[in-house]
């Protein structure tokens, strides 16, 4: 046997190592390529959404500043930690907060809808830009929480009864557009173990349109021990209407001159209300200032009544249409505001100042960016 001419037998183990090394290198190359593709897609998305992103960032900075001012005006302990002795501190502007929040909602809807389109139609996770999607979503939720605090629960802070020494949550409560009053007796009822009830229209707690004369006419005596009621009152024991349903009044002649104008305006608003109806939009779709958001959320929760952090229980007042608006909350609002269409968030903010019990989530038509009041 010629040992010199014999070739050594190759081992199979180095070959396996080489294959594993090659596959590992190939996987790393694919991962790098995917990262570059995602970066390119994110750049492309941000270039398309540049105006919306710029508007969102500017308004979010403005909203953070306004939220700080609002907190400092409510709790003085935040003033020194955030503003120190500088002259930057000033008074908060509720109107500016509402308009800025509405602008944030509009710009974030544009961003989130575009990223959602890329995710559904191109198969890109988070639309190719997860950081942008999270920033837009959390900024939008922050704007919603501020709006909810300033609008939905505004009446809870200004609920009637303070002049009588009544405490909100203990003696008076607002629920579904009605002012609930707790009786002095310890009677077990349906709300909080107390006898919560809606007072008669003549009660000082009740709000009726116009002046106190409405309450006088509400129990106008027409003879034969019968009363004429101008307001429906389901809470009253004798709410069933009996006797004459009309009485005579003197109307100034000047009212006839504005009849046509008022009628045409009423018809225009009624047409808008009928044609558009009450569109129920989808819930807000699923933003980097995490620490600031958490800090502001905590401060708002402990300082402002009605500010509800995401995930906490809350009372939601639903906008159910003109015909179902209770008489208590039909005052101090032009009828044209209750059913109108605006196409800009600034105008929507103007309307929200009057609609104290309107859920902003019910006013955003995300795809068309039309706001219904």
UniProtKB/Swiss-Prot annotation:
Record-linked Pfam families: MAT1-1-2
Transmembrane region(s): none
Region of interest called Disordered, as start-end residue ranges on this chain: 1-22
Family under the similarity heading: To P.anserina SMR1.
Protein name (record): Mating-type protein A-2
Source species: Neurospora crassa (strain ATCC 24698 / 74-OR23-1A / CBS 708.71 / DSM 1257 / FGSC 987)
Lineage: Eukaryota, Fungi, Dikarya, Ascomycota, Pezizomycotina
């Amino acid at each position: 046997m010629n040992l010199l001419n014999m070739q050594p037998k190759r081992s199979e183990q180095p070959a396996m190592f080489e294959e594993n090394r090659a596959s590992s290198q190939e996987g790393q190359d694919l991962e790098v390529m995917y990262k570059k593709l995602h970066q390119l897609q994110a750049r492309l998305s941000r270039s398309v959404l540049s105006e919306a992103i710029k508007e969102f960032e500017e308004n979010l900075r403005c909203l953070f500043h306004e939220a700080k001012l609002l907190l400092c005006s409510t709790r003085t302990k935040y003033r020194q930690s955030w503003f120190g002795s500088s002259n930057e501190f000033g008074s908060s502007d509720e109107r500016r907060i509402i308009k800025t929040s509405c602008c944030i909602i509009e710009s974030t809807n544009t961003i989130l809808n575009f990223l959602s389109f890329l995710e559904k139609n191109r198969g890109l996770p988070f639309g190719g830009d997860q950081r942008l999607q999270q920033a837009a979503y959390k900024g939008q939720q922050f704007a919603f929480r501020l709006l909810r605090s300033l609008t939905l629960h505004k009446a809870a802070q200004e609920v009637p009864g303070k002049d009588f020494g009544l405490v909100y949550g203990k003696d008076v409560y607002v629920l579904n557009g009605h002012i609930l009053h707790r009786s002095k007796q310890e009677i077990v009822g349906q709300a909080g173990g107390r006898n919560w009830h809606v007072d008669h229209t003549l009660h000082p707690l009740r709000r009726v349109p116009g002046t106190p004369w409405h309450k006088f006419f509400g129990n106008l005596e027409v003879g034969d021990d019968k009363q004429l009621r101008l307001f429906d009152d389901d809470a009253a024991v004798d709410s069933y209407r009996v006797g004459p349903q009309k009485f005579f009044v003197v109307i100034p002649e000047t009212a006839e001159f504005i009849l046509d104008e008022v009628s045409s305006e009423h018809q225009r608003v009624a047409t808008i209300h009928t044609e558009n109806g009450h569109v129920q939009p989808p819930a807000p779709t699923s933003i980097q200032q995490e620490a600031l958001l958490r800090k502001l959320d905590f401060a708002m929760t402990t300082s402002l009544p009605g500010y509800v952090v995401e995930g906490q229980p809350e009372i939601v007042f639903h906008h159910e249409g003109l015909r179902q608006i209770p008489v208590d909350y039909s005052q101090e609002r032009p009828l044209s505001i209750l059913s109108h269409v605006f196409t800009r968030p600034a105008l929507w903010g103007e309307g929200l100042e009057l609609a104290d019990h309107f859920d902003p989530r019910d006013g955003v038509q995300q795809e068309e960016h039309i706001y219904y009041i």
